[in-house]
Amino acid sequence: ALVLTMGLTSCDGLLDLTPKSEISQDDYFKTESDLQLFSNSFYNNLLDKSPFDDQSDLYVQQNLSDEMLGGNNRTVPASGGGWTWTDLRKMNTLLAYVNQCSDENAVVKYTALTRFFRAFFYFEKVKRFGDVPWYDVELGSADEALYKPRDSRELVMTKMIEDIDYAIDNLPAREEESSSPFRVNRWAALALKAQFCLYEGTYRKYHDLKLEGNDYTYYLDLAAKAAGEIINDGPYKLYSTGHPESDYLNLFAAEDANPDEYILAIKFDYSLAIHHNANGHTLVPTQGRPGLTRKMVNMYLMKDGSRFTDQPGWQEMSFLEETKDRDPRLAQSIRTPGYTRIGETTVLPPDLSVTVTGYQPIKFVQEPTASGGQVDRNDRNTNDLPVYRYAEVLLNYAEAKAELGTLTQEDLDISVNLLRDRAGMNDAHLNMAAANANPDRYLSAKETGYPNVSGSNKGVILEIRRERAVELNQEGFRFDDLVRWKAGACIDQDIYGMYFAGAGEYDLSGDGNPDVILYNKGTAKPEAGSGVLVYEIGKDILLTGSNSGYVYSHKNIVRNGFNEERDYLYP
């Protein structure tokens, strides 16, 4: 409450007001071009940061985020911290003046577009703060409404649904072909509705949120219907060339967004100096040393659909053993034995100097020749990034139906099992009856999973969560998922990497030659060939045991824990 009061005592702390005279309704908003130019800035909200560097229990960097450190490290600045409202003011400004345009079709179109972005804006605020003040009019510096308290979550969600339904009803189905993945259309609006209704429904269910108005089933039903409309009536499909060993990787590494799967994407362009940092982030030692965690790798099924964590001896398998015969998406998400970069023939091992866990990410990594051969430098990627893609819609549909208790095998066959088909796992479909008859112990355990999942659909809900983690890994969903599932305890779990049995030579590329040599303290440092990393156990590389175990790079980092009473929302 104190933080809110402080924010409300300053006009620019709340709505970041600018003089109203800067935009004159007599001079602007008269043509469709005016509306388009003014609304272009709204697109900057879609990706406020790179999705591939979000940290969680499944993906970490050398320096842990405040959320991962927990305790007093998770602080909110006196101003900012997400409590910024400038973009909302711009949206409400356009809505206040849009009728000055004489083109009625343009008025409807840009009203719909702006209401899409207002729903998007408030979704981000609700996720972060819970209750927030709702503003749908342009405010001046003297307006008393600046000082009103937060509105209820129920009111804000109701208004968001009104906005997104207007957008769905009035946005075009598809823009001109050249810009279709980069402009908001009615399918993107449906994708947003499915996303925020799934979030709200599961948040209310698992947090046992009792509010006046609609219960969690109302939102889950809306999510399922919105996703179902895209599935049944939309023009989208999963990208596939019939090469399951590379299609998933190539989808994200491609320069241009695939219009079949990407419903909405962000355009990057080397000639315009609009870049992101996927290559530098994963290939340069000073860019964070990201890595998937052992928990994430454990989630990938065997290629035949059986669970890796049901295999004998899975806890202490070598890297060569644990990556064999797995879901093909694993080898398209991290470097595994036999890995070569796109367009190259040299086999490369995971490079422990650039990954904190040993599981080196390759998703979104472009070929070395991209960006004029400069792509491996800091901030030089130009491959387009997804905001909404069809795969997420399929997962949202399956999860909403499962949580509602209305899921059928047919629903799985038009959603989750299409993802497995694309991955080449045609004979490893998710079977609802089998999953519910034998819920996965690993995903049920307090130490590694979600012990609060229960009911007759427990098994299939766990498997849908597995599929979501695998398919959407490194796309910025995980922390939000943990929040809505009330699974913050996952943040507290130990962060492990690949397993090493002790001192010795380790082949990580599968070519029969050592890539890493470990030796014990007090013994002579081994001689090594070019490119071979030599690490002293306990000094250069930390393991869970004194001389063997999982990579445990954060072993000496003090983590203060996730506070269940505080950390699901910011103040």
Q: Can you say where each PLM-predicted feature lies in the sequence?
A:
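An aromatic- and glycine-enriched ligand-binding surface/loop that stacks and positions planar moieties
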Residues: D12-M68, M157, D165-I168, R183-L190, ...
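Short coil/turn linking the two alpha-helices of tandem helical-hairpin repeats
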Residues: V126-P133, E175, F196-D208, E403-T406
